[in-house]
């Protein structure tokens, strides 16, 4: 790649976003299968972004459970989105099938009380429905985050779950990612050079 410009043009490849998105999704799927998981439930912002190539809005950051994604077997990711943000995802992220964008059943991590238990039941029922749709309901679900409400509801629903954070951490740097890191380093490097 001869040019690292950030603006897309029709006469240079520059950053191939499709290739990066495909790489990340397939890499997550590969790691999921290597760990004998039928599905991955991703609740941390960085993992949701890695698999879905969507951005977590500021008010959802660092709050696992407000927005999450489910990767089942060889299927496209299912994104459970906050409110009507899903409408914007449908418009701006055509790589996620429209039928795979759902409303999230959200609670803030570690919440207590009857309302949080009601929400986590809806949350779990929605996960099981998607896992059945992709024929992985009898397989182990990898999770990158779990709280006491999820733990209790997963046990009640007879969901076999395991560590999903470790597979997500096992990544290598594709050449495209190296290019992006070089681009993001350029402005501060220029600043220090001028000092």
How does the language model describe each region?
Residues 1-191:
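A composition/biophysics-driven feature that prefers long, compositionally simple stretches
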Residues 193-195:
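Extended, charge-rich low-complexity interaction segments
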């Amino acid at each position: 790649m001869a040019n690292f410009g950030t603006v897309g043009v029709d006469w240079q490849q520059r950053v191939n976003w499709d290739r990066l998105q495909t790489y990340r999704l397939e890499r997550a799927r590969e790691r999921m299968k290597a760990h004998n998981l039928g599905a991955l439930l991703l609740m941390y912002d960085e993992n949701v972004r890695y698999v879905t190539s969507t951005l977590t809005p500021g008010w959802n950051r660092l709050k696992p459970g407000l927005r999450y994604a489910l990767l089942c077997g060889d299927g496209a990711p299912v994104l459970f989105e906050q409110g009507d943000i899903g409408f914007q995802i449908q418009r701006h992220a055509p790589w996620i099938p429209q039928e795979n964008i759902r409303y999230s059943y959200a609670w803030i991590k570690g919440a207590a009380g009857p309302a949080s238990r009601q929400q986590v039941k809806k949350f779990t029922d929605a996960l099981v429905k998607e896992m059945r749709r992709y024929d992985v309901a009898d397989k182990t679900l990898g999770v990158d985050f779990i709280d006491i409400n999820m733990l209790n509801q997963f046990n009640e629903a007879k969901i076999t779950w395991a560590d999903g954070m470790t597979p997500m951490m096992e990544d290598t740097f594709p050449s495209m990612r190296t290019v992006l890191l070089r681009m993001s380093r350029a402005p501060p490097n220029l600043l220090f050079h001028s000092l």
